[in-house]
Curated annotation (Swiss-Prot):
Lineage of producing organism: Bacteria, Pseudomonadati, Pseudomonadota, Betaproteobacteria, Burkholderiales
Function, as annotated: Transport of potassium into the cell. Likely operates as a K(+):H(+) symporter.
InterPro entries named among the record's database cross-references: K+_transporter, K_trans_C, K_trans_N, Kup
UniProt-recorded name of the protein: Probable potassium transport system protein Kup
Keyword Transmembrane helix: yes
Family: Belongs to the HAK/KUP transporter (TC 2.A.72) family.
Amino acid sequence: MTQSTTSHYYVESPSSRALVVGAIGVVFGDIGTSPLYSLKECFSPEHGIPFSPDAVLGIISMLFWAFVIVVSLKYVMFVMRADNNGEGGILALMALALRTAAPRSRMAKLIMMFGIFGACMFYGDAVITPAISVLSAVEGLEIAAPGLSHFVIPITLLILALLFFIQRSGTHVVGKLFGPIMVVWFLALGALGLIHLVQAPGIVKAINPVYAVSFLHDHSLQAFIVLGSVFLVLTGAEALYADMGHFGAKPIRTAWFVLVMPCLILNYFGQGAMLLGNPDAIENPFYLMVPSALQLPMVLLATAATVIASQAVISGAFSLTSQAIQLGFMPRMRIRYTSAAEIGQIYMPVINWILLVLVICVVLAFKKSDNLAAAYGIAVTTTMVITTFLAALVMRNVWKWNPALVTLISLTFLVVDMSFFAANLLKIAEGGWFPLLMGGSAFFLLMTWHSGRKLLRARSLEDGIPLEPFIAGLLAHPPHRVEGTAVFLTGNTESVPVSLLHNLKHNRVLHERVVFLQFVTRDIPYVDDDERLSCKDLGGGVYILKSEYGFKETPDVQRVLDLAQRKLGMQFELMETSFFIARESVIPSKLPGMSMWRESLFAWMHQNGAKPSDFFSIPANRVVELGTKVEI
């Protein structure tokens, strides 16, 4: 996606092969590192499943059919069809589903809350994924070099700290290696699995779903608990849809069916084959399937793969936060672009350091990947259930599919999703509470901000003066006009900006050209430059300039002025242009709205958000900020 008109990930259109390799490096890092801990966790003593060949076959069968139903059918075949101008992810899906509901209706509010809650659950995932991935990789030292086992946590913390510290410089240089490294990783997974599969080919019987059904029937409650661990193989599946805008659906589908899925299935079947012949290997089936001489190199390769998986999640957190800001669910924050070639490469200091602190706390609190596995999954299952609901709305109301077909497809996926969700709920006390707490806290903050902004707009409209009649009266009896251009940033072009009223009150002048600039976020990810600007001439050198942006773009005032010059013929000399911004101080009150403590929280968030001049990239020496107090 170029910064101007397209939604492609790279400025120059890369080849299909490059897109496939790039997708392997970014999209499949999380799901690709699950073999490090998933099968081991399925046989955790806490589940009470006695080890037996039938149990191995049953669990491997469940893993196989989880890949087929959830990833291959649900995400690859159905959900990835629901693109919003090429973009995927739960916020893009929410925007699509919202088009099917009447504005401000109860259904629209419900869709919005579901979508935002699903997105918020990603923040819990963004903390746990780096912790469990890197920790499980470094734990390979306990097998490869037992003498270094007491250094597992310090090494993990060092790697994670370095990963977060390099975010400010961007990862676009080393990022070119992500794809090739992950290709090597998946080939290694497949090769290791194939070696053991050849030695015990009987494990192939697990393809028969009868083994999964028999396991569930024979072990009832224990098998249901194991479902929560089986789900670990699917963590990261949602990335196939979320990263669709970066690489396109076809390269992601190709990577999944040609390399990723075959190699993952080979590895899990290989681990199962090894366990049939050596039950003691359940201590760490992944590393024990590696020949002794290659265990240390495999630890290094696994660590590289988990760092790549963690990087994808961190970048996802930055991207999600940026989208939430544009959609009006978060206060403005500093966003830095770390690559001139890829608009998706952004860095958000506040989010970066919060994640680092939380990841370190999680590693120190849980200490082992086994313990973290209990906390993993609940956030992803929640998002998957919500995705199924939203996709059903899109299938029925946007694509106009037959209601019976939509019901059949949705119920099939919902039964699977809810089974995994219910199984993960059993792990709340063991650590599942953490991602729920993270996601719930984020949801509360986002909804508080959204509600506070609505109150703020309502108060402004109540006290506002209609803009066009005011300008007509002002031009009929004009104050002293001074040279230059005044740009007034406003969120509502129906009312007179407070900054203009204060300027007239205190300075008693009006610039020879006045521009009211409004940024509007649309429900699509990107807006073409040809459709971005609209201008209304109010006469007397006064204009309303509206600039539309997608929810994955960041407004830039200088770029808008350049575009206005090219598209509309409006000349702007930056050093002769002053930008007037109203800096609102929010005062909590007993007026109808939110509770006082939530209003106080909103006021604090509003006060600590990034300055509009920083967020909109306005030169600091051209900004005039005028303060005003608003009671909500």
